[in-house]
Amino acid sequence: MNSQDLKKRQEKIRNFSIIAHIDHGKSTLADRILEKTETVSSREMQAQLLDSMDLERERGITIKLNAIELNYTARDGETYIFHLIDTPGHVDFTYEVSRSLAACEGAILVVDAAQGIEAQTLANVYLALDNDLEILPVINKIDLPAADPERVCHEVEDVIGLDASEAVLASAKAGIGIEEILEQIVEKVPAPTGDVDAPLQALIFDSVYDAYRGVILQVRIVNGIVKPGDKIQMMSNGKTFDVTEVGIFTPKAVGRDFLATGDVGYVAASIKTVADTRVGDTVTLANNPAKEALHGYKQMNPMVFAGIYPIESNKYNDLREALEKLQLNDASLQFEPETSQALGFGFRCGFLGLLHMDVIQERLEREFNIDLIMTAPSVVYHVHTTDEDMIEVSNPSEFPDPTRVAFIEEPYVKAQIMVPQEFVGAVMELSQRKRGDFVTMDYIDDNRVNVIYQIPLAEIVFDFFDKLKSSTRGYASFDYDMSEYRRSQLVKMDILLNGDKVDALSFIVHKEFAYERGKIIVEKLKKIIPRQQFEVPIQAAIGQKIVARSDIKALRKNVLAKCYGGDVSRKRKLLEKQKAGKKRMKAIGSVEVPQEAFLSVLSMDDDAKK
């Protein structure tokens, strides 16, 4: 095709994504669009078609983004090329959303006609506005008995400030309004800008590892054209590769002769190592490079850290390989090797949130068959020492000695909670119990309230979300952004078994709750750790000070069983001998700590504040 034809083709391209809160019907809408445009035959059709991971289908959530090309013949008789980029809706996967939005010109905002706007909807809309996208509101599930499309349209106008007069009323499940949505995409979403004759600039928004072809890049072509045989160059590190294949997804990969400006597809170039490609990097041609890289998206910083250790120590290298493969298309997962006296060799991993941590753990166990021990999650603290240094600490066992600490700052988040009016009291009580500071409260409509609190991230990573759902019968929706670091009265609590510190059980706690939590955890460990041949003291300590203690009584063999009557001094001699043996055993004996003990540090929060 010459450049005139390519420019004409470019005018027919529409790149869009679907943004919505969990369960508002995003994946179902994507399924209907695929059916309507006959991208997928009815024989291949299955629910949640784009959620290809087992985990996504089971949990009913979208974790990874997906990009698909569809052809749609509009009412004006022209055939348009649509690129649908499916995005996740959960707060932990916001970076996936921002990546997919960077590859689009428009976004379909799906709002449930019964539930209305939720916290996560708002967060994603702001991301779309940051990327200057054309937003098309769709009120979904209008066939539900509880649907109230008028109220929801008012919410869209009042809360988000979008004009909802032309919002499409649809039901993805029943297939109502799908054609209207497709027509609006044609009319309202702008065609991609960019110059086919300019040097190649392609944004990498995802990558997948293929055992035979190496790393396969998913790209959005912003300027220029790429075809097999070209020599491409990564702009961040200057490495070059020969393109072996380019193509699109329909959802299956289909090879093409070229990818031109505005296209969204894949590039295979025998890239062997994961480290050579970074999501957000710009690809250009080695012989005619672009002058500057594209404005990528900001690197997401992990908010939650935890240690991951293989239960069988010989699986350490397998775990490293598995993490590297996951990191390939999950740019926000970070890890570095660490050792623990209690757990051996493992990795300290950084995650965006608890769901992200959960998903990574499940993927490691399922896809790579590795049995893991996870330590309690912690956040990044700023520890200011007496010699005026500031250390960032994400692992409690790396905390400096208390005598060297001047003060500690912890991260606070701005939590936005949307909840029906009757549960406002429960939400405020929970937030205050989690050391939250009230900021403001707005009424969205007669019944729903938007409550904003500043809460320490450390309190949120434990079980804030579960507690919030249970105290509001599942009606609350929740979203948070990093806010600032603040001074807090924090201390490090160590757990000692038989006088030895167990590094993997250490945790950071607010001074106010230290005694309570120490007491709860030693009692929990007493129940979990099996009895030994000798007595085992369990102690909770802050620095040198023991704040709680509990003893596991020794198992005792009855050495007097074979003495029928007889001299008391004979019995005493046997008992003394047993006592000396126990003493020697206690001095050299080590205590096996079961997996549940590490998890009990996580769940102690339940009891600490009842």
Curated annotation (Swiss-Prot):
EC identifiers of the protein: 3.6.5.n1
InterPro entries assigned to the protein according to its UniProt record, in alphabetical order: EF-4, EFG_II, EFG_III/V, EFG_V-like, EFTu-like_2, G_TR_CS, LepA_C_sf, LepA_CTD
Stored Pfam families: EFG_C, EFG_III, GTP_EFTU, GTP_EFTU_D2, LepA_C
UniProt-recorded name of the protein: Elongation factor 4
Gene: lepA
Record-level Gene Ontology MF annotations: GTP binding; GTPase activity; ribosome binding; translation elongation factor activity
A GO cellular-component term linked to this record: plasma membrane
Family: Belongs to the TRAFAC class translation factor GTPase superfamily. Classic translation factor GTPase family. LepA subfamily.
Function: Required for accurate and efficient protein synthesis under certain stress conditions. May act as a fidelity factor of the translation reaction, by catalyzing a one-codon backward translocation of tRNAs on improperly translocated ribosomes. Back-translocation proceeds from a post-translocation (POST) complex to a pre-translocation (PRE) complex, thus giving elongation factor G a second chance to translocate the tRNAs correctly. Binds to ribosomes in a GTP-dependent manner.
Membrane protein topology class: Peripheral membrane protein
Reaction catalysis annotation: GTP + H2O = GDP + phosphate + H(+)
Keyword terms, alphabetized: Cell membrane, GTP-binding, Hydrolase, Membrane, Nucleotide-binding, Protein biosynthesis
Coiled coil: none
GO BP term (any one): positive regulation of translation
Organism encoding this protein: Streptococcus pyogenes serotype M3 (strain ATCC BAA-595 / MGAS315)
Localization in the cell: Cell membrane
Positions contributing to GTP binding: D23, H24, G25, K26, S27, T28, N140, K141, I142, D143
Domain tr-type G: 11-193
